[in-house]
């Protein structure tokens, strides 16, 4: 289940990537995740961040292979994402080893911070 529309920026020097997710009214969750007032579920925001971290691991650390989701820590939700809108996800690698990557992630929608978390990934 693809949760990113694309990657818009890669900064190899600072181990940072920015992804974009276009949130539309025809997504599978819209009808049921708060009827009459659709809100992008927090778990899908986290999944967007995890997918971006997997991409970042492959691009920024090529010999690491595929990075799978291992853990999410310190998740905080500070706003809502209502379709139609665009969610930007930023991931900065803060710890990289052969066994794992750790990234600090943020989601921004309409210029507002809507979530932040720390994602850990591991080669699978």
Predicted regions and their residues:
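Hydrophobic beta-strand-centered segment that forms part of the acyl-chain substrate-binding groove
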Residues: 50-90, 114, 122
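Generic structural detector for well-ordered beta-strands
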Residues: 8, 20-22, 76, 92, ...
């Amino acid at each position: 289940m693809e949760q990113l529309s694309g990657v818009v920026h890669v900064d190899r020097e600072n181990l940072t990537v920015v992804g974009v997710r276009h949130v539309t009214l025809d997504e599978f969750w819209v009808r049921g995740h708060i009827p009459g007032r659709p809100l992008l579920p927090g778990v899908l925001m986290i999944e967007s961040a995890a997918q971006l971290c997997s991409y970042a691991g492959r691009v920024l650390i090529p010999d690491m292979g595929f990075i799978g989701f291992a853990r999410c820590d310190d998740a905080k939700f500070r706003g809502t994402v209502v379709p139609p809108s665009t969610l930007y996800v930023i991931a900065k690698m803060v710890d990289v080893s052969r066994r794992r990557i750790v990234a600090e992630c943020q989601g921004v929608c309409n210029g507002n911070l809507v979530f932040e978390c720390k994602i850990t990934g591991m080669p699978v």
